Amino acid sequence: MDGPFGFVVIDKPAGHTSHSCVSRLRRCYGLKRVGHGGTLDPAVTGVLPIALGPATRLLPYLPGDKTYRGVIQLGSITSSDDLEGELLRQAPWPDLQPEELEVALAPFRGPIQQRPPQVSAVHVDGERAHARARRGEQMVLPPRPVTIHRLQLLHWDPNQGQLTLEVHCSAGTYIRSLARDLGEQLGCGGCLAQLRRTQALGFLESQAQALPEADATPPPPLSPLLALEHLPRRQLTDSEEADWRCGRRLSLDPGPGDAVVVCNADGSMAGIGLRQEDDQLQPKVVFDASG
């Protein structure tokens, strides 16, 4: 494989956009094909997986769930559902015990319908909602199905009206919406005060590195196989490798799932195949010696 191939996990600092991190790595690696796996708002820090070279073709096959650690401020309602937006209203928060907060959090666990924030990347009539919101347009975005797999109360500060949560959720979940809706349920309003992503697309906080300077030597990329452990694998024999690169179907043992990771005889990444009804493997993403 010519050139860098794999993933770099950046610990995105506050103040940077996801796009600015991608631009920095393009310069560091001298690559055009660089893409990130899930936008983080500028104020949010944490895990930002970035694909290098041909690995950008693997982004749709990575697990979509994410984990966040966030602080919710009760008693404040803003235009963006976080402290970055215009303060619209303030109210005193109730005197709550942790047990009462657990009761309030219970309806948000599992599959729920969630309304995205007005300042979001959701498309409205072909345009991003945040562009309309910045022009002063008021929108009521329709709720969408999301799943909150785990919602854990880590800390409650009754003096500041702040609670710290850990949230493991499906793709498309907005923690700002969770803050808004929880505050609404408690009758005082709420918004997101602070957020850090600790896991995304199969990559962990422990794998994240600081964003390198533009002229710095970039870190070696991680193997794409690290983020594809949720998929079944099919290892090629030496004689099958040429068939795979020519796009020919291969035999496949019965098993779950549609996407299958395909590895060369030496264990390196060969691509992604799709399981067919006749238990044949159809090449979908094929990597060869030239990428």
Curated annotation (Swiss-Prot):
Responsible for synthesis of pseudouridine from uracil-55 in the psi GC loop of transfer RNAs. This is tRNA pseudouridine synthase B. It comes from the Bacteria. Its EC number is 5.4.99.25. One of its GO terms (molecular function) is tRNA pseudouridine(55) synthase activity. The active site is at D41. It catalyses: uridine(55) in tRNA = pseudouridine(55) in tRNA. It holds the Pfam family TruB_N. It is an enzyme of class 5 (isomerase).
